[in-house]
């Protein structure tokens, strides 16, 4: 009986409140959804892929951008229907992936954006990265950028060790 009363009540109720996203700070999108979109490195790759297909990134609406993310984003949200950009390709050797990222970022190559984008999890941030899965779990692997020193990974590892040491009780 309660379910019928609620249904009857909701059928007669109209909601007049509307929320319209403003142009700032999220380009006509709401923060909860904007957080799903790539920025930095991921946006750079996406723009290059779209350009190859003759699409200007600036002409896309927030809904079109979210449909490109589909179910491949890092968060819990999934956007359907999905719009597929590029081709699904398997993850190459991590050293090869690092070199591909450096070549694309330095604009020496324009052939590997789809491999990098597909395996990036639509990443944010400025550094190249990929999602890697093995028997021990899932990993976010960060690579160095063209302006990073060659031992950047070792430096980040050492900072992590210091952080762990300082966090001990």
Predicted segments, located by residue:
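Phosphate/dinucleotide-binding and metal-coordinating scaffold of catalytic cores
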Residues: 1-169
């Amino acid at each position: 009986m309660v379910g019928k009363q609620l249904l009857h009540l909701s059928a007669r109720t109209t909601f007049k409140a509307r929320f319209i996203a403003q142009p700032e700070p999220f380009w006509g999108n709401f923060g909860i959804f904007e957080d799903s979109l790539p920025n930095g490195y991921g946006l750079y790759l996406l723009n290059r892929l779209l350009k190859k297909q003759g699409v200007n990134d600036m002409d896309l609406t927030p809904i079109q951008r979210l449909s490109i993310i589909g179910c491949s984003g890092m968060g819990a949200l999934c956007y359907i229907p999905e719009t597929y950009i590029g081709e699904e390709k398997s993850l190459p050797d991590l050293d090869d992936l690092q070199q591909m990222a450096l070549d694309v970022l330095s604009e020496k190559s324009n052939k590997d954006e789809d491999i990098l984008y597909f395996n990036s999890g639509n990443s944010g941030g400025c550094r190249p990265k990929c999602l890697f899965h093995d028997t021990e779990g899932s990993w976010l692997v960060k690579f160095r950028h063209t302006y990073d020193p060659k031992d950047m990974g070792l430096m980040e590892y050492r900072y992590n060790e210091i952080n762990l040491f300082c966090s001990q009780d």
